[in-house]
C-alpha cells in the first residue's frame, strides 16, 4: 500500500467517523437508536450505497469488532455497581444460559423451516442470533431510569450470555464440517470451560491489573492506557485458551470499577470516549460488510423469523429462565422479554461460517444482519414507551452536570459534584443554612455570573447559580432530590404515594393510624414496616417495588443494600386512576 492510499484511507475513516458523530444528534429527535445511524452510514458508504466502497475483508472485520467489543465491555463492567450483582446475578446467569439455549433452539427450528435448511443449519442461525448484545443494551438502556432489578438483569445478561452463543456457534460449525448429527459429552465440558476460564481469568487478571495500577506511579494520562491494554490482554489470553474473552473482560472491568483504584475518574472519562469510538468503528465496519441488495430476496422469511424470535422465542426463554425467581412480577418479565436487543455480536458470530467456508455462509450472515436491523428498529425505538407501559421506570433524580474525583489516594472516595440551578429548581430563593445537606457533604464553592462568591449561611440561591459540592457517590440520590425540579415531591407523590414513611416505623402503629384491616400476624410480632414489605416482596428489594396489602399500595422509596429505608403509601384505588 503506497503513501497516497494510506492518506486516502485516513481521510475516508475520519469522514465516516465525523459523519457518524454529527448525525448522532438526530437519534433522539427521530426516535431511532444511535447504533442504527452508525450502521446506516456504513451501509451508505458500502458497495450498494453512495460511497460504492467494496469491502469483504471478514478477518479484518472480525478483528475490529472483537477489539471494539473488548473496549465496550471493559467500560460497561467498570460502570456496573456491585449492588447490581447482589440483586440480579443469578436471574441474569439463568437467562444467559438456559435463556440462550431456548431462544437458539426455537429460533433455529423456525429458521430451518422458513429457509428450507437442514435442522443443524437452522440451529446454527438460531445460535448466531441467540444472545443479546452488550453494546446495544448499554447504549440504549442508559438514562432510561429503569428499576435496579430490571436494569441490572438486562445489563449482566448481555455481558454474560455471549459465551453460550459463541460456543453453540463454533460447535455447530464443526458438526456441519464433520457431517455430525449428534452431540457428545464434550458439549458440556466446553460450556464449563468457556464460563470457567472467563470467570477465573477475568477476576484473576483484573485483580493483578488493579494491583499494578495502584502500586505503580505514572503520569495521570497513562493510567487509562494501562487499564485498557491490560483489559485487552485479558480478553486475548482468555480467548486463546478457549475461554470466553467477552465474559473475562467484562468481569475485569467490574472488578476495577468496584475496588479503590488510582485515577478512577480519569480512567472512566477516557473510557467513555473510547467506548463511543469503538461503537462507531464496529458498526461502520459491519455496515460496510453487508450488501443491502442481498437482503431483498430473504426479506420476507427473515422478517418472519425476527417476529418469531421477538414475540415467541425470547418471551418463552425469559419466562422459563426466570421461573425460579419470584421477585420478578409479570410486568417486569414482559419488559425483559421485550428487551432482547440484538446488535454487533450476532453479526460477528455470522462471520464465523464465512471464515469456515460453509456452503450457506452468506445466507447465515444476511439473515443475522436482517434480524439485528429489525431488533434495533422495532425494540430499540420502542424501549422508552415499553418501560413506561410496564411501569418499570422509577422517578429520576437530578444528576450533577460534572463530576470530578479528588484522587488524592486510591482509597479516597471523595468527589466534587457541580450543579447548575435552573428556574425550575425548588431550592431557588432558599438560604444555604436551610438546605438539608447529607451528612459529611460540603458546599465548596458558589459561582454567580461567572464570579466566585464567599457565601454565608444567609446567602440565598438564585437562578443560574453554580454549586460545587464535596461528597461521595452514595450522596448523589439525596443531593439529586435537593436540587430537583419544583415542587420537590410532586413526582414522588405520583409514583410513591401521598406519604413516604420511615421503614423503621412499627406496622401496628401505621395500621392504627390509617385504620387498616388485616396483617394481624405482623402486628403480633411487632414487625417494622420495612420488614413487612420485604417479607411480602419475597426478594431483595429495589426502589420502585410495589406490593398491595391491606387495601393500600406500599412502594419501596429508598433502600440501602438489601434493607428498606423509606416506604411510600397510597390507597389501592389510586392504581386505577
From Swiss-Prot:
Look up keyword Cell inner membrane and say if it applies: yes
The residue ranges of the RCK C-terminal domain are 403-485
Q: Which GO terms describe its cellular component?
A: plasma membrane
Q: How does it sit in the membrane?
A: Multi-pass membrane protein
- Which UniProt keywords are listed? Antiport, Cell inner membrane, Cell membrane, Ion transport, Membrane, Potassium, Potassium transport, Transmembrane, Transmembrane helix, Transport
**UniProt catalytic activity:** K(+)(in) + H(+)(out) = K(+)(out) + H(+)(in)
In the record, what terms sit under GO molecular function?
Answer: flavin adenine dinucleotide binding; potassium:proton antiporter activity
Q: Where located?
A: Cell inner membrane
Task: Tell me any Pfam family this protein matches.
Answer: TrkA_C
What transmembrane ranges does the database entry give? 3-23, 30-50, 58-78, 95-115, 122-142, 185-205, 216-236, 237-257, 280-300, 303-323, 334-354, 363-383
Q: Name one GO biological process term.
A: cell volume homeostasis
Q: Which family does it belong to?
A: Belongs to the monovalent cation:proton antiporter 1 (CPA1) transporter (TC 2.A.36) family. NhaP2 subfamily.
Annotated function: K(+)/H(+) antiporter that extrudes potassium in exchange for external protons and maintains the internal concentration of potassium under toxic levels.
* Full protein name: K(+)/H(+) antiporter NhaP2
Q: What is the originating organism of this protein?
A: Klebsiella pneumoniae (strain 342)
Instruction: Provide the organism lineage as a comma list.
Output: Bacteria, Pseudomonadati, Pseudomonadota, Gammaproteobacteria, Enterobacterales
Amino acid at each position: 500500500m503506497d503513501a497516497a492510499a494510506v492518506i486516502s484511507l485516513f481521510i475516508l475513516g475520519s469522514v465516516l467517523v465525523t459523519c457518524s458523530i454529527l448525525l448522532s444528534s438526530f437519534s433522539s429527535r427521530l426516535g431511532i437508536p444511535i447504533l442504527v445511524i452508525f450502521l446506516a452510514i456504513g451501509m451508505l458508504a458500502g458497495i450498494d450505497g453512495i460511497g460504492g466502497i467494496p469491502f469483504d475483508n471478514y478477518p479484518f472485520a472480525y478483528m475490529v469488532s472483537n477489539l471494539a467489543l473488548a473496549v465496550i465491555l471493559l467500560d460497561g463492567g467498570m460502570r456496573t455497581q456491585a449492588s447490581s450483582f447482589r440483586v440480579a446475578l443469578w436471574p441474569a446467569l439463568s437467562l444467559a444460559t438456559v435463556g440462550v439455549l431456548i431462544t437458539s433452539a426455537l429460533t433455529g427450528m423456525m429458521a430451518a423451516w422458513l429457509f428450507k435448511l437442514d435442522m443443524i443449519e437452522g440451529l446454527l442461525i438460531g445460535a448466531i442470533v441467540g444472545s443479546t448484545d452488550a453494546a446495544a443494551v448499554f447504549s440504549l438502556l442508559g438514562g432510561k431510569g429503569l428499576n435496579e432489578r430490571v436494569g441490572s438483569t438486562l445489563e449482566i445478561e448481555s455481558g454474560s450470555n455471549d459465551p453460550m452463543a459463541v460456543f453453540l456457534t463454533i460447535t455447530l460449525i464443526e458438526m456441519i464440517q464433520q457431517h455430525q448429527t449428534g452431540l457428545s459429552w464434550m458439549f458440556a465440558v466446553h460450556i464449563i470451560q468457556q464460563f470457567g476460564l472467563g470467570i477465573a481469568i477475568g477476576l484473576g487478571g483484573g485483580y493483578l491489573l488493579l494491583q499494578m495500577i495502584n502500586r505503580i506511579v505514572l503520569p495521570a494520562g497513562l493510567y487509562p492506557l494501562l487499564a485498557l491494554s491490560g483489559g485487552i490482554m485479558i480478553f486475548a489470553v482468555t480467548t486463546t485458551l478457549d475461554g470466553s474473552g467477552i465474559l473475562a473482560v467484562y468481569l475485569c472491568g467490574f472488578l476495577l470499577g468496584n475496588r479503590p483504584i488510582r485515577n478512577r475518574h480519569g480512567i472512566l472519562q477516557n473510557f467513555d470516549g473510547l467506548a463511543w469510538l469503538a461503537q462507531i468503528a464496529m458498526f461502520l465496519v459491519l455496515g460496510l460488510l453487508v450488501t443491502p441488495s442481498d437482503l431483498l430476496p430473504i426479506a420476507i422469511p427473515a422478517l418472519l423469523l425476527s417476529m418469531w424470535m421477538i414475540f415467541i422465542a425470547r418471551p418463552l426463554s425469559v419466562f422459563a429462565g426466570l421461573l425460579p425467581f419470584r421477585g420478578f412480577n409479570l410486568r417486569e418479565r414482559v419488559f425483559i422479554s421485550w428487551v432482547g436487543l440484538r446488535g454487533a455480536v450476532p453479526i460477528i458470530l455470522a462471520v464465523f461460517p464465512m471464515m469456515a467456508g460453509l456452503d450457506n455462509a452468506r445466507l447465515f450472515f444476511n439473515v443475522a444482519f436482517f434480524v439485528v436491523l429489525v431488533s434495533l428498529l422495532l425494540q430499540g425505538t420502542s424501549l422508552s414507551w415499553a418501560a413506561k407501559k410496564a411501569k418499570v421506570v422509577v422517578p429520576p433524580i437530578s444528576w450533577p452536570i460534572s463530576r470530578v474525583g479528588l484522587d488524592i489516594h486510591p482509597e479516597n472516595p471523595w468527589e466534587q459534584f457541580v450543579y447548575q440551578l435552573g428556574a425550575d429548581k425548588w431550592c431557588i430563593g432558599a438560604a444555604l443554612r436551610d438546605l438539608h445537606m447529607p451528612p459529611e457533604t460540603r458546599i465548596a464553592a458558589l459561582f454567580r455570573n461567572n464570579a466566585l462568591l464567599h457565601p454565608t449561611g444567609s446567602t440565598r440561591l438564585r437562578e443560574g447559580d453554580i454549586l460545587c459540592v464535596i461528597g461521595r457517590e452514595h450522596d448523589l440520590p439525596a443531593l439529586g432530590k435537593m436540587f430537583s425540579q419544583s415542587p420537590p415531591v410532586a413526582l414522588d407523590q405520583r409514583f410513591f404515594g401521598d406519604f413516604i414513611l420511615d421503614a423503621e416505623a412499627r406496622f401496628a402503629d401505621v395500621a392504627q393510624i390509617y385504620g387498616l384491616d388485616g396483617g394481624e400476624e405482623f402486628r403480633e410480632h411487632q414487625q417494622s414496616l420495612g420488614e413487612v414489605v420485604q417479607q411480602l416482596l419475597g426478594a431483595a428489594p429495589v426502589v420502585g417495588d410495589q406490593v398491595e396489602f391491606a387495601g393500600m399500595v406500599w412502594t419501596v422509596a429508598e433502600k440501602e443494600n438489601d434493607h428498606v429505608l423509606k416506604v411510600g403509601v397510597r390507597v389501592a384505588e389510586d392504581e386505577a386512576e
